């Protein structure tokens, strides 16, 4: 399993994502967004464990939950930005 961090425009969207991942059986934790990741938005995101990003994003799309950015969290502490959803 890989660990991804997804940022959202509002805490409500982040909370909806947390519930959707729970329903899908994926491990997920609501967290404060690190300050360097904040661009615009609420300052909250979700850390989710899933086999790949596609699996994680399918849950959000099925529930119609837009996200701002996605990141892969490496075991060594590194972070890799993967993509955007919202303009």
Model feature map: region roles:
Residues 54-87:
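C-terminal structural segments of small proteins and small subunits
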Residues 2-12, 17-22, 26-57:
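Amphipathic, hydrophobic secondary-structure cores in small proteins
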């Amino acid at each position: 399993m890989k660990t991804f961090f997804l940022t959202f425009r509002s805490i409500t969207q982040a909370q909806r994502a947390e519930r959707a991942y729970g329903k899908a059986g994926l491990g997920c934790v609501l967290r404060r967004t690190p300050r360097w990741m904040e661009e615009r938005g609420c300052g909250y995101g979700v850390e989710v464990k899933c086999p790949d990003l596609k699996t994680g994003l399918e849950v959000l799309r099925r529930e119609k939950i837009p996200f701002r950015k996605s990141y892969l969290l490496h075991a060594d502490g590194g972070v890799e930005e993967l993509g955007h959803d919202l303009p």
